[in-house]
């Protein structure tokens, strides 16, 4: 079985976990590791794009469990194209963030950035609505943490507004998913 469809989720998960434990690394090492992880994600995305370019759809059942009990990842041309686009934008964003880094940034930025990529790429690959909700929540939690990165008073105030609006949106999303599954 080809395990490549899970790689866009595993790479940022592993990179983010390593970066969480790397608080004593020099900033340049964290920058380089995070950038290497994104370049690896771009390589995987391009490989997946090439694999589905002729039309086949890759389906990956985690743990061998079939739906509706298992988590299913689906890679089609749209998902693969969005993975490539995400990796390119992430690479450009990280290069910009590294260039603007004055050495005073908190060491958790790169880990949170990787976890945000985990949520985005998982949302593109998921094959059902409930797991789409789960990946959206992973994405939102990482974005809340990035927004609060630094704990300035204006950031906390802005984060409170974002969290309240996103909680309302998440509740409506979950209600919609429950209604769809209930039908």
Indicate residue ranges for each PLM-predicted region.
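Transmembrane helix-loop-helix hairpins at membrane boundaries of multipass inner-membrane proteins
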Residues: 2-6, 17-111
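N-terminal transmembrane alpha-helices
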Residues: 5-9, 13-17, 117, 121, ...
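Proline-rich low-complexity regions
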Residues: 5-8, 12, 68, 142, ...
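Specific lipid-exposed transmembrane alpha-helices and their immediate membrane-water interface residues
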Residues: 10, 14-15, 49-54, 58, ...
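Generic enzyme active-site microenvironment
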Residues: 10, 74, 135
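Small-residue-rich packing faces within the transmembrane alpha-helices of Major Facilitator Superfamily
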Residues: 13-16, 42-45, 91, 114, ...
């Amino acid at each position: 079985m080809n395990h490549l469809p899970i790689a866009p989720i595993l790479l940022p998960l592993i990179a983010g976990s390593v970066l969480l434990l790397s608080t004593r690394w020099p900033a340049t090492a964290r920058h380089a590791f995070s950038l290497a992880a994104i370049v690896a994600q771009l390589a995987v995305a391009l490989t997946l794009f090439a694999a589905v370019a002729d039309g086949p759809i890759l389906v990956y059942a985690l743990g061998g469990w079939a739906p509706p009990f298992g988590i299913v990842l689906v890679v089609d041309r749209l998902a693969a194209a969005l993975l490539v686009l995400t990796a390119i934008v992430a690479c450009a964003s990280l290069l910009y963030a590294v260039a603007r880094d004055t050495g005073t940034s908190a060491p958790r930025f790169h880990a949170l950035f990787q976890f945000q990529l985990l949520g985005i790429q998982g949302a593109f690959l998921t094959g059902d609505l409930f797991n789409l909700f789960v990946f959206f929540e992973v994405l939102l939690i990482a974005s809340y943490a990035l927004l609060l990165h630094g704990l300035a008073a204006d950031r906390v105030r802005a984060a409170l507004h974002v969290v309240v609006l996103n909680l309302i949106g998440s509740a409506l999303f979950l209600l919609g998913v429950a209604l769809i599954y209930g039908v």
